[in-house]
């Protein structure tokens, strides 16, 4: 199974993510072609090699023509919806922008629709977020991991004045994420970097065994006594089956308006749940109820528990630690009459399974105005001939 690991020894920011992923050897022209599917103008991208403490990495500089442009969250979501990017990228991008906007709204005591500021409105942030997601999709990795994040210390000047490091919005975004301080001064994690990494990666204390194939370094803009670089590794996970430790949060609910469950499930996924499901149950005194089950990475326990307590009527949550085995998987492409479609293929000990990617099938069904089941059936027939 192909995996990617973010080694955040100097923190993380949007431009560092872009630089590190491009440094892996991505086809930059193909990436820029994908960027052109975003309905925004007024920027150009400069990519160069730079040295940080004798280590060379890729520096990505996004030059904005108009520095006076401001946008609200609604504007950003419209840009995402109107882009020609994949549904997978659109969903993750919306989650990232929501995280930044929610954090700023809470810190500045504003309704989320009134948040009007540089951080989510700036063009470079739009390119950081969507550009990073495009690069990750181009790499076709199945698993993404990250080290804990160093927060830095001191103070930083912003459009809102001088604020402490980590910036309050950054810390808000990182609730439930493993972080640490080691005495280094300076802002090491930006709100954009925090929002991207907390959306795409599973945080681990130790990197699972991986056969490293490529290594990339992305340059930060500031110079410190240590190399201001983000390092990424890409390679194959070594174990025949990937083992993953998760937590299951459960609670029985019998006194809540059922309309709330749909919103709750969406909220839990947005906050980092791996899976959420509802099971009808009979509880004490013969009362019908719903068993809410949430599967999540260990580091998301506190964050998701808070969502459950805040959004439901429950007074308690059970937690169960579980080990999960995953068949090694890879993504392949198959040529169809509608264009290329991604296929997820899993193999272990002679057992083979293959499935067309749902988002690709959904896009075809919507574009061609044909039933989704017909699209899936046609692609499955093509897969049998391969």
From Swiss-Prot:
UniProtKB keywords: Nickel
Molecular functions (GO terms): lyase activity; nickel cation binding
Keyword Ligase: no
Domain of life: Bacteria
This protein's record includes keyword Membrane: no
InterPro entries per UniProt: Ni_insertion
Family, similarity comment: Belongs to the LarC family.
PANTHER family, sorted: NICKEL INSERTION PROTEIN-RELATED, PYRIDINIUM-3,5-BISTHIOCARBOXYLIC ACID MONONUCLEOTIDE NICKEL INSERTION PROTEIN
Protein name: Putative nickel insertion protein
Species per Swiss-Prot/TrEMBL record: Dictyoglomus thermophilum (strain ATCC 35947 / DSM 3960 / H-6-12)
Lineage, uppermost ranks: Bacteria, Pseudomonadati, Dictyoglomota, Dictyoglomia, Dictyoglomales
